[in-house]
A protein has these predicted regions:
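Active-site substrate-recognition loop segments, prototypically the cytochrome P450 B′-helix/B-C loop
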Residues: 25-39
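Extended, well-ordered alpha-helical segments in internal regulatory regions
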Residues: 101-112, 126, 182-189
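Acidic, glycine-rich segments characteristic of secretory precursors and extracytoplasmic regions
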Residues: 1-25
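Well-ordered alpha-helical segments within folded domains of soluble proteins
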Residues: 67-75, 126-127, 178-184
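Aromatic- and glycine-enriched pocket-lining scaffold segments that form the walls
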Residues: 161-189
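Short coil/linker segments at helix-helix boundaries
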Residues: 108-149
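Conserved, well-structured interaction surfaces
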Residues: 37-109, 141, 156-166
Length: 189
C-alpha cells in the first residue's frame, strides 16, 4: 500500500497553463518561440486542443485522474484487508491525495467557488472507486458537491496521517503538508 501511494500524487500541475494565460507572460517577438503549442494557445486565450503534454489541459486532467485512481486502489486494498489500524496512516494519505487531485482539477476546470452559486455550477466527476471498466460514464455533479466531497476526504484523512510512517516524509502528505493543503482548500471553500 505504501509503495502504491507514491503514484497517488499528480505528475502534472496547472502552473504553466495558468502563467501563460496571466499577465505574467509577454510576447517577446519572432525570435522567441514557445516549447509547446499549448503555451501559445494559453497566452492568446485560445482553446488548447492540440497538445497532450503535461502542461496542456488533457495532460493535467489525465495525470490527476491517474493519481486519484492510485489513491482509490490503495483505499480499496485497505478495505479488502479489513481496514486494519496499522494501515490507518496510509488510508489518511490516500484520502488526502484523492482530495488533492480533485481540488487541482476543480480549481483549474471549474468556475471559482461561490457558496451562493455553487449548487448551480458544474463541478468535476468525483471518482471514489477504482475503475473496473475502460472510460466509464461519470456524473459530473455540481461544484458544491465536488467541494463537499473534497472537504469530507480532508476531514477523514487528516487525523489519520502519521509523520512516523516514512523515514523521509518530505515527499508525502505528512501532518504539516496535509494541514497546509487543507488551509489552501478552505481559502477557496
Amino acid at each position: 500500500i505504501t509503495s502504491l501511494l507514491v503514484s497517488a500524487y499528480p505528475a502534472a500541475f496547472p502552473v504553466m497553463m495558468a502563467e501563460m494565460a496571466s499577465d505574467n507572460a509577454m510576447d517577446n517577438g519572432p525570435l522567441f518561440s514557445v516549447e509547446f503549442q499549448s503555451q501559445e494557445d494559453a497566452y492568446l486565450w485560445q482553446d488548447i486542443v492540440t497538445d497532450t503534454d503535461e502542461d496542456a489541459p488533457q495532460g493535467l486532467w489525465d495525470a490527476c485522474y491517474l493519481a486519484i485512481a492510485s489513491a482509490n486502489h490503495a483505499l480499496q486494498a485497505i478495505e479488502t484487508m479489513g481496514n486494519p489500524s496499522s494501515l490507518a496512516p496510509q488510508r489518511g494519505e490516500a484520502l488526502i491525495c484523492r482530495a488533492y487531485g480533485h481540488f487541482i482539477l476543480a480549481n483549474t476546470f471549474c468556475e471559482a467557488y461561490n457558496y451562493e452559486t455553487a449548487s448551480k455550477k458544474l463541478g468535476i466527476p468525483y471518482a471514489i472507486n477504482p475503475e473496473t471498466e475502460v472510460s466509464p460514464d461519470y456524473i459530473r455533479g455540481t461544484l458544491e458537491e465536488t467541494f463537499s466531497k473534497i472537504a469530507a476526504d480532508i476531514q477523514e484523512g487528516l487525523p489519520l496521517i502519521d509523520d512516523n510512517l516514512y523515514s523521509v516524509p518530505k515527499y508525502h502528505f505528512n501532518k504539516k503538508a496535509g494541514y497546509a493543503f487543507a488551509t489552501r482548500f478552505y481559502l477557496y471553500y
